[in-house]
Amino acid sequence: MYFICLNDLRFPKNKTELYFPVKKKHEWANSATGKKRRWRKKRRKEAYFSYMGKILKQIHPDFSGRSWVLYALGALNAWQLEWVSLEAFRLSFYNHRRAITGREILGAVKQRSSQKSF
């Protein structure tokens, strides 16, 4: 049996302390990804309306016979316009498309106009 002599070894008196500076609520996530988060503002009616108008202008530049869609979109409240955009997203999902096209927007407006609350 062997005994180990510890007389000559010196242990540090003070333990090493790690100091972590206090970070704010969302800085931990930022430091983990290395990017700053950009907080999105609440979307307004104008954002939905301009986006759908741009899509419809790409598909139908002259709007011959399609101007009722813009009138219908302009007459909607914010929550109704959000409903139409969600319905257009559902239609694009069912058709296995990643982007919302004018066909989905027209279909969503037709579905919404067929209901009595429109």
From Swiss-Prot:
Membrane spanning stretches: none
SUPFAM superfamilies assigned: Histone-fold
Keyword Nucleus attributed: yes
Subcellular location as annotated: Nucleus; Chromosome
Molecular function terms, GO-annotated: DNA binding; protein heterodimerization activity; structural constituent of chromatin
Keyword Nucleus: yes
Tissue/organ expression: Expressed in germline. Predominantly expressed in oocytes.
This protein's GO CC annotations: nucleosome; nucleus
Family affiliation: Belongs to the histone H2B family.
Subunit structure: The nucleosome is a histone octamer containing two molecules each of H2A, H2B, H3 and H4 assembled in one H3-H4 heterotetramer and two H2A-H2B heterodimers. The octamer wraps approximately 147 bp of DNA.
Name of this chain's protein: Histone H2B.N
Species per Swiss-Prot/TrEMBL record: Homo sapiens (Human)
